[in-house]
């Protein structure tokens, strides 16, 4: 018990040397006695086994007033407001600028609602010749076939009269008939070609194109009658 009471008394009332000794020393100023005297009177009032800290707490409003009154010295620049810790008061930072595309790249066009603009597909000439009649019967294609000319009865009658007198037409006569019957020169030419083929078939005449090709392939057919004729004259 005696030892514990001694320790408690030493903690509660610490003993310091007299102030005169500190005043005589060279490393302490004149404020030593006042400092230690005030500390003994106010700070060292303990309630328990352990000493109380010397930290003096200040009220929140007083600390805020002192913090607002003190301003750092600057070169005429106003101090910016402290950042707010609330998300509602924070200012929205501007978004970074979009990168500029290079010359070889084209930016993709977008609609106002965010959907990409659909560009028309490129159709090449060789793509138009695809047979799509089975898929879409209304599609005529890029190069539709020429429709057959439907001759009227009056036109056919006039062409038959001309064919009866002349099976082959000259260029001038063909142009005259085309202007008279309101037809093209090509239509007159095709009609006469078809009519001659029909006439040869009706009269069972050989085709002139086939005969000329066969004679060109066998040139000895023309020389044989000539040799035979010479032989007869010699006799």
From Swiss-Prot:
Report the locations given in the UniProt record: Nucleus
Q: Which InterPro entries match?
A: Antp_homeobox_Deformed_sf, HD, HD_metazoa, Homeobox_antennapedia, Homeobox_Antennapedia_CS, Homeobox_CS, Homeodomain-like_sf
Q: Which ranges of the sequence are annotated as binding DNA?
A: 144-203
Cellular component GO terms held in the UniProt record: nucleoplasm
Q: Which SUPFAM superfamilies match?
A: Homeodomain-like (SSF46689)
Provide the residue span(s) of the region labelled Disordered: 66-93, 202-235
What are the Basic and acidic residues biased-composition ranges?
225-235
The reply to whether Transcription regulation figures as a keyword in the UniProt entry is yes
Which UniProt keywords are present, listed alphabetically?
Developmental protein, DNA-binding, Homeobox, Nucleus, Transcription, Transcription regulation
Point out the coiled-coil segments of this chain. Answer: none
* Pfam families xref list: Homeodomain
Please tell me which stretches of this chain the record labels as motif Antp-type hexapeptide.
Answer: 123-128
Q: What is its main location?
A: nucleus
**Is the keyword Ligase assigned to this protein?**
no
GO molecular function terms noted in the UniProt entry:
DNA-binding transcription factor activity, RNA polymerase II-specific; RNA polymerase II cis-regulatory region sequence-specific DNA binding
Q: Which GO terms describe its biological process?
A: anterior/posterior pattern specification; embryonic skeletal system morphogenesis; positive regulation of transcription by RNA polymerase II
**Stretches with biased composition (Polar residues):** 209-221
What does the protein in this record do?
Sequence-specific transcription factor which is part of a developmental regulatory system that provides cells with specific positional identities on the anterior-posterior axis. Binds to sites in the 5'-flanking sequence of its coding region with various affinities. The consensus sequences of the high and low affinity binding sites are 5'-TAATGA[CG]-3' and 5'-CTAATTTT-3'.
Q: Which family does it belong to?
A: Belongs to the Antp homeobox family. Deformed subfamily.
> What is the designated name of this protein?
Homeobox protein Hox-D4
* Source organism (scientific name): Gallus gallus
